[in-house]
């Protein structure tokens, strides 16, 4: 307890604030930073907007694989953001993203919601999803369907970088 008090005292001039793991998770989702739920073993750097981390000059393990046809397909699932149209309904993690919720089964899914939070910055729910042709779907109105929660939520596809997309706050 003594150490905690001292840290808070010394940090006053820097306006430090304590936070927990849930706050850390919310920050990562709002910023579009990927974690375990987005990295499922099928995801490559280009799917998660991490192409800047892939060397164009140096050789590395897996470089040759990135040029295989399965990884260069234009309709690969990509990381995007998802916001409910009504700005109030939370989107359950694991929900399917579909064009038409009334389509005959099996309803062709475009992807799935990987993480959800309440955006403190914008005061509405926000989710990350991995969907086919993701970057070209930004601005589209689709549906998030959760069979487990028996919910169908009209959503809009947005950038995965919901808060501070230019990265000005971290500089």
Residue ranges, per PLM feature:
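Conserved, structured C-terminal
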Residues: 1-171
């Amino acid at each position: 307890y003594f150490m905690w008090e001292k840290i808070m005292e010394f940090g006053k001039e820097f306006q430090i604030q304590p936070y927990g793991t849930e706050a850390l998770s919310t920050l990562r989702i709002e910023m579009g930073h990927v974690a375990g739920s987005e990295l499922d073993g099928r995801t490559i750097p280009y799917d998660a907007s991490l192409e800047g981390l892939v060397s164009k000059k140096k050789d590395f393990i897996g470089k040759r694989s990135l040029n295989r046809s399965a990884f260069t397909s234009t309709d690969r699932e990509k990381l995007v953001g998802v916001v409910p149209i009504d700005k109030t309904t939370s989107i359950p993690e694991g929900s399917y993203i579909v064009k038409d919720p009334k389509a005959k089964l099996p309803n062709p899914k475009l992807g799935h919601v990987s993480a959800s939070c309440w955006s403190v910055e914008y005061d509405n729910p926000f989710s990350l999803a991995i969907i086919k042709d993701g970057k070209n779907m930004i601005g589209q109105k689709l549906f998030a369907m959760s069979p487990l929660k028996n919910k169908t939520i009209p959503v809009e596809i947005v950038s995965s970088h919901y808060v501070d997309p230019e990265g000005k706050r971290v500089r």
